[in-house]
Amino acid sequence: MSNLDPDAIRAICEDACGSLDVPGGIPRSADAVQQLVFTVGAEVGGRDIRRQIGGPALSWWQIEPATIIDCASSWLRYRPAIEAAITRHLSPGMSLVDGVYDDPLIAAMVARVVYRRSPLNLVCPDDIRGQSRVWKQAYNTPLGKGTEREAVERYMAWVGPNYHPLDGGE
């Protein structure tokens, strides 16, 4: 498994948030972009893992198929602008679950929807501990195996001490 480039992941997250920033969509924010970058560090430690080892989660954002289906059926279907922003990236006949597995842009967009559905506010891009709290409560959930401390450690081991989220890298 190779390590993912944090700047390349940031570019995907920028594109995902930009693609959702349509009338009736989800406004793009630096907080959201960084939360998505942090999530890749928290979930896979920046490693190229697209399918959870011993589990169902998919993509670098490790989204479970049940979560993807729930997002589509109970949230996206009532927000046609956001649904259209995502589904326009799917190949004809491709399910959203397959899209999350096959296309990092789609995966990042769905991860953004997971965070948007949460009542929690996103935090400033340079607040790594705050991002960890949001990740644990809104994404990994209190019942999930991950801890805030482990998430910060995995993220920092991936990006290194000189990575600055506000300027997109070193």
Feature map (PLM): residue ranges:
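Ser/Thr/Pro-rich, acidic low-complexity intrinsically disordered regulatory segments
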Residues: 1-25, 137-140, 144-146, 160-170
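Short, structured coil/loop segments at alpha-helix boundaries
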Residues: 6, 29, 75, 79, ...
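Alpha-helical scaffolds flanking conserved acidic
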Residues: 29-38, 126-134
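C-terminal/domain-terminus segments
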Residues: 122-145
